[in-house]
Amino acid sequence: MNNQQINYSVAIRTLGKAGVAYETLIHCLKRQTIVPQKIVVYLAEGYAAPAKVDDEVIVYCKKGMAHQRALTYDEIDTELVLLCDDDVYFAEDSVEKMLTALAAENADCVSANVFPNHDMRFRQKVLKGIFYGELPSFSKRFAFCIRKSSNYSYCNNPRDVMESQSCAGPCMMIKKTVNNSLGYQDELWLDQFPYTSGQDQIFAYKLYRYGYKLCVHYSAGVIHLDCKTGHVKDEVLADFNKRKIKYLEWYRSIYEPAGKMQKIFVSISYYLYWTWLFGLSLINVLPGRRRYKISNSVRALSEARKHVKSPEFAGIPKWEVKR
């Protein structure tokens, strides 16, 4: 690859709380074998700006994980944009590997795999499957598949680079025109919920359903340091919103785009998953722990079904899927 012919910029999403991890990120970016043309730090309004490490530019944006994901990067002139969280570590050739994969696979987006599900111990895989619906697969095509319940399956024996239907959100190289064509501004409903979740999966799966090619790179040398700048103060509310959002995510990305007959099948898939989770909640009560999960299961489903019928949610443009 001719390093002189590749131009890309970096967009960092932050609350300004990553500290040393943020400094490490900037230093890593400056040491890349292919140096970025520009580094723009998108800081949520209401937070103090981190101390500048180099020549990065700080731009304020609206607070909210979905709002930060929905940016159109008007401050960036290059077509290729490296989107990353503020607590990611890069090996010196990480970006070069991602750019090489982008060209070789004729992809529109390449995500670095920072959560190696396939490397978990057998016991962890079993527990993840039981409690979170995250199942291993032996797909030879996809790194991650989104199932009809909106849960994902991960390739248990991946190649270095694989096409995917979803990906982790902390680090991805994407074409700016592709990013801006997704209409992710329609997903800002996610930010109305405290302790929101699902914004990364919705972004990645929308990319796939809109006909773009998403790839996952398993050996790019990117590490998520996970500074955990968000803190859960209300565990009950966080659990409730996670369950409610899961239904809304399924409704937006799986149910709405489905055909008339497909809607029956995907509905059965989701309610089987919900029944499984409800059963786990009942079992969890036996030792006297987290009884709120039972009421949350029922109440979240009830409120989510009402929510999709509200004028505000029903008025959101539907996905224009191509596959």
Give the role of each language-model region.
Residues 167-169, 191-203:
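Acidic donor-binding loop at a coil-to-helix junction in glycosyltransferase catalytic cores
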Residues 131-164:
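Short, flexible, basic/aromatic active-site loop/helix in glycosyltransferases
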